[in-house]
From Swiss-Prot:
It catalyses: AMP + diphosphate = 5-phospho-alpha-D-ribose 1-diphosphate + adenine. Keywords: Cytoplasm, Glycosyltransferase, Plasmid, Purine salvage, Transferase. GO terms for cellular component: cytoplasm. This is Adenine phosphoribosyltransferase 2.
Length: 184
């Protein structure tokens, strides 16, 4: 169960949620402590609670589309788009989208690479909420936000299932609202 913290704009993991997260040292590379959300999401109703927590925080915000980052961002992004009744745009790894695509570079705490979006989906004034599973250093989310702005879109905010506060990733994300269903 996820317990909301009043007036924080985020939620905290209660004791059972903390126990459900698994940690894998040195994955995917040395020096990284990987936080695995899969066991937490396997709990009955957990995904619904995450989506409800984020949806309540963006209530009243104008959002045209959720941009969800490949692949675990799709977990939150698709469910949230359905709940909010807005569009859903996939931000994919190279070679996963057919047709014309636009690409941009990103870097995070353990890698760098390229992401792609189907050409023509983001246009002038499209209000986008960027969704991913985890906010660590903010590199992927920042690059995605910069891409949206380069296409004439606007950032309505950023949404994450889990935020690792000690890495201070939210400092990288403009002045747009940052919503994390859980923090650790």
């Amino acid at each position: 169960m996820i317990v909301a913290v009043p007036n924080s704009g985020a939620s905290r993991i209660n004791q059972s949620g903390v126990e459900a997260l698994r940690e894998f040292p040195n994955f995917p590379i040395g020096g990284i402590l990987f936080k695995d959300i899969a066991p937490m999401l396997a709990g009955r109703g957990a995904l619904g609670e995450v989506v409800s927590t984020v949806a309540s925080q963006v209530s009243g915000t104008e959002i045209d589309a959720i941009l969800a980052v490949d692949a675990r961002g799709f977990i939150l992004g698709a469910s949230l788009a359905d709940r909010l009744g807005c569009g859903f745009i996939m931000v994919r790894k190279p070679g996963k989208l057919p047709g014309d695509v636009l690409s941009f570079e990103y870097s995070c705490e353990y890698c760098s690479g390229t992401l792609e979006v189907t050409a023509g989906l983001i246009g002038d004034g499209l209000r986008c909420l960027i969704a991913d599973d985890l906010l660590a250093t903010g590199g992927t989310a920042r690059a995605t936000g910069n891409f949206v702005k380069s296409q004439g879109g606007e950032i309505a905010g950023y949404a994450f299932i889990l935020e690792i506060e000690v890495l201070k990733g939210r400092r990288q994300l403009d002045d747009a609202p940052v919503i994390s269903a859980m923090t650790c």
